[in-house]
């Protein structure tokens, strides 16, 4: 009888520890804070356009991105920074806000921009190897006359 109670207590303790771990992990993923920087982009008219970006450098930051965010203020974005040039692929799973993305080479030149659909599982791929990707509210690039060939001052 004592052995049965001891085994039940052990299982209960393991269950409580596992539950605490899962709650802590879920809360820490939601509380992810991104480093922010003020950057600028020279648009097609030669004007300097300021933008405040959140930096996504780690796998964890890149995986989280704008997932779950309902509102992304104008003049802000998220800059994904990769260690080397590669063909990039993004999707909008669990992302409720329409976004535009710019694929940027290692020199800071925008090579292409694309629009992305909320909650889409379809990937949006760069057509060539690039080092960076910049996500902004959909339409921001067009409003600011930013497109292929524009230069972003990188961190």
Regions found by a protein language model. Name each.
Residues 13-26:
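Bacterial N-terminal signal peptides
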Residues 3-16:
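Bacterial N-terminal signal peptides that target proteins for export
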